């Protein structure tokens, strides 16, 4: 994650605290000593979304004395959940890091060589963690206390609440002596990767006895390609076995160790080569490529499935890359050992992708074997892993099978010539810059319960881009996916609408690239060239990285990892516009224009028809009629006016057609989905229906409902219009008092009456 971005988010947290507490002088002083940048967040809602504090915010609002600032919410969260851990665990307990919602809450324990057995009961997240004395005495002679990571036992829960582990009071002298012996081990500080991999382990729901194995399970070759749950950690060994009083033993050295597989070319390439691709985080995104549904079997690498009672991987979720043990691990028979030990992960484990930010600093790649290097030569330990079968859908993401290659993404920083060309296409001159309305506009959603599907517009200007994206998001919400009820489609969860936003952006840029390629522009926070000559810097274009993809599925995967930049911003609207232009290419965009000197952003930062057409149809043509119109000037010169060449997914209606200024063709007026971008009074908004039959069955057009959404109108409630085509309205009626939206509506349904159903008509 970019350090500069982290600093700006932290500074925004402090500014919000000072503002809400009325510390005006301190607030002004901070602005003077640390001025804001383009990455600063000025909206409390945006700040909550960036830090994923929506759950804590809603929980706080329900309290009698709610806290006023996000900083206090975070502070109370830490105090409530981690303030008393020190009373229940040993002195080496580490303070957990702040976790993102739906990600692992680390609850570290010191590694031990005792035979203490922890039993976790997670059937109900509101029950506390319990330890059974009877199970301890039963399993002391043959169980392991060291976890697979050597230092940490983590559990992931969908709730934001964590409970401390209750340890057994009055440990025996044997247990105490084992603690002392563990302290004497030359253990190095766990690496960052080891800490992260601690998030991946979660006990099974129900009663799990750690360290007790159910035995090996025979599996078919097909299973071995799907799940390598039973495998030994290559080149790693466990710590020494626990010493019994009066009979000290020297640990035996393992005589058989497996080696790390050599990275292979093609589909069988190992994760080591993938995680160390020069493209950094881009290549790692393949681990997040496949999502699963509750009914689909998880395709995990492993030797077979373990019984339900064995230890299991909990976190096959948004931050869990696959672990491919390689062909060597398949050929090596498992060696069973009950020696206690700390078995860190192998070097094959890729660095976890920063999916919400879409980037990963190279500095985070550290040696993943810093712990294991101190322990070589000890006994090998069979690593028990299993698959969680009771996960919530939003937390599930399938690890890819071995046939899935890494993302084929070509990335390069923008250069001066490309930036000049883009500005000329956008503004007509390379001296123009994006206005603040454009820079601060992203695709953040409405917080109102009845308008959760809606994208909020801060100020005028980029309304054409927002309306086009809104239409594509509605297409995904209403007519794709498995939402069974209309109300569920229009009241999506945060994860669902974010997913639909990523799909909508993917459709827009893929369509602009002729369904053959796409270019996604992302801000890096670092200036890549020095502006010289006839070019004026705006702080946005100079920081872009251009990511080119030629596969739609990989494009969707890539956007799901980087959707944070589009949704939370601050340049989401700019990034999408530039992505569409570069996907189409500046040369083809210029060829789409009727006049080569046209541009996509007009006066006062308004969107032109060319820009809206580019987002809706993939071509930046200047007109809305069908096909091409030839104009003969009379002297033999023929001027070609380019229109819409094919039927569009999202439609378009214009008030200009009511005034006979233009004519909207049937390719836009009758789209594939009943969603229309409406141009009225130099502003773009959206009109849509939930009935797909409206465009397929003429009988559905007799009486139907349309929903209207305007992201700029500070709309608080859903506006539903009932259109009746059986009751016609005279066209000679005084148009001065007729809402423009009704006039736009009648360009599609001639003379139809419109009932606003109690909503105030928008004039």
Curated annotation (Swiss-Prot):
Membrane-traversing stretches: none
Stretches the record annotates as Disordered: 154-368
GO molecular function: cysteine-type deubiquitinase activity; K48-linked deubiquitinase activity
Domain of life: Eukaryota
SMART domains linked to this entry: DUF4205
Protein purpose: Probable hydrolase that can remove 'Lys-48'-linked conjugated ubiquitin from proteins.
Name recorded for this polypeptide: Probable ubiquitin carboxyl-terminal hydrolase MINDY-4
Gene source species: Bos taurus
Gene behind this protein: MINDY4
């Amino acid at each position: 994650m970019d350090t500069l971005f982290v600093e700006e988010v932290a500074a925004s947290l402090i500014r919000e605290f000072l503002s809400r507490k009325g510390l005006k002088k301190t607030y002004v002083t901070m602005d003077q000593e640390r001025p804001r940048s383009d990455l600063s967040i000025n909206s409390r809602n945006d700040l909550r979304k960036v830090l994923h504090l929506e759950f804590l915010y809603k929980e706080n609002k329900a309290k009698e004395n709610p806290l006023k600032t996000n900083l206090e919410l975070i502070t109370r969260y830490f105090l409530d959940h981690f303030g008393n851990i020190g009373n229940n665990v040993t002195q080496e307990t580490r303070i957990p890091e702040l976790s993102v919602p739906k990600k692992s809450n680390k609850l570290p324990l010191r590694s031990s060589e005792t035979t203490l057995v922890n039993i976790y009961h997670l059937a109900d997240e509101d029950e506390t963690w319990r330890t059974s004395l009877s199970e301890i005495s039963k399993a002391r002679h043959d169980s392991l206390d060291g976890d697979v990571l050597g230092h940490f036992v983590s559990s992931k829960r969908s709730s934001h609440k964590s409970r401390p582990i209750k340890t057994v009071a009055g440990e025996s002298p044997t247990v105490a002596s084992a603690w002392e012996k563990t302290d004497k081990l030359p253990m190095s500080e766990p690496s960052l990767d080891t800490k992260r991999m601690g998030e991946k382990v979660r006990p099974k729901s129900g009663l799990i006895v750690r360290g007790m194995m159910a035995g090996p399970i025979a599996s078919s070759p097909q299973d071995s390609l799907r799940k390598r749950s039973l495998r030994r950690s290559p080149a790693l060994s466990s710590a020494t076995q626990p010493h019994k009083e009066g009979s000290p033993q020297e640990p035996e050295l393992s005589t058989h160790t497996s080696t790390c597989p050599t990275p292979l070319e093609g589909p069988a390439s190992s994760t080591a080569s993938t995680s160390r691709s020069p493209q950094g985080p881009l290549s790692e995104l393949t681990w997040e490529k496949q999502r699963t549904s509750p009914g689909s079997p998880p395709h995990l690498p492993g030797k077979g499935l373990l019984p339900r009672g064995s230890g299991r991987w909990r976190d096959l979720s948004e931050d869990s890359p696959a672990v491919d043990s390689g062909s060597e691990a398949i050929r090596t028979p498992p060696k069973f050992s009950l020696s206690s030990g700390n078995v860190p992960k192998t070097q094959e484990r890729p660095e976890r992708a920063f999916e919400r930010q879409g980037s990963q600093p190279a500095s985070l790649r550290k040696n993943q074997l810093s712990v294991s290097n101190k322990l070589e030569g000890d006994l090998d330990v069979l690593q028990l892993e299993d698959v969680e079968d009771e996960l919530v859908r939003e937390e599930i993401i399938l690890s890819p099978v071995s046939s899935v290659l890494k993302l084929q993404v070509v990335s390069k920083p923008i250069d001066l010539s490309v930036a000049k060309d883009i500005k000329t296409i956008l503004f007509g001159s390379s001296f123009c810059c994006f206005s603040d309305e454009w820079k601060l506009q992203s695709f953040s959603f409405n917080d109102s319960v009845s308008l959760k599907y809606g994208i909020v517009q801060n100020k005028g200007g980029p309304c054409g881009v927002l309306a086009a994206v809104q239409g594509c998001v509605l297409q995904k919400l209403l007519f794709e996916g498995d939402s069974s009820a209309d109300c569920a489609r229009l009241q999506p969860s945060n994860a669902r609408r974010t997913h639909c936003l990523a799909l909508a952006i993917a459709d827009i840029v893929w369509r602009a690239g002729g369904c053959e390629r796409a270019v996604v522009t992302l801000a890096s926070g670092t200036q890549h060239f020095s502006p010289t000559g006839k070019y004026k810097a705006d702080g946005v274009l100079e920081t872009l990285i251009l990511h080119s993809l030629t596969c739609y599925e990989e494009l969707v995967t890539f956007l799901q990892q980087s959707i944070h930049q589009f949704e939370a911003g601050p340049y989401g609207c700019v990034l999408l516009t530039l992505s569409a232009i570069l996907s189409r290419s500046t040369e083809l965009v210029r060829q789409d224009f009727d006049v080569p000197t046209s541009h996509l952003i007009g006066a006062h930062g308004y969107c032109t028809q060319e820009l809206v057409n580019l987002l809706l149809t993939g071509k930046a043509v200047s007109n809305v009629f069908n096909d091409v119109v030839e104009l003969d000037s009379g002297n033999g010169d023929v001027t070609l006016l380019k229109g819409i060449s094919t039927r569009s997914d999202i439609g378009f209606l214009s008030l200009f057609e009511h005034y006979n200024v233009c004519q909207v063709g049937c390719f836009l007026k009758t789209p594939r989905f009943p969603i229309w971008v409406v141009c009225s009074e130099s502003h773009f908004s959206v009109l849509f229906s939930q009935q797909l039959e409206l465009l397929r069955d003429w009988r559905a057009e007799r009486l139907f409902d349309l929903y209207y959404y305007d992201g700029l109108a500070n709309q608080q409630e859903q506006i539903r219009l009932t259109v009746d085509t059986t009751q016609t309205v005279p066209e000679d009626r005084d148009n001065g008092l007729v809402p423009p939206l009704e006039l736009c509506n009648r360009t599609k349904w001639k003379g139809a009456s419109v009932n606003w159903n109690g909503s105030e008509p928008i004039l």
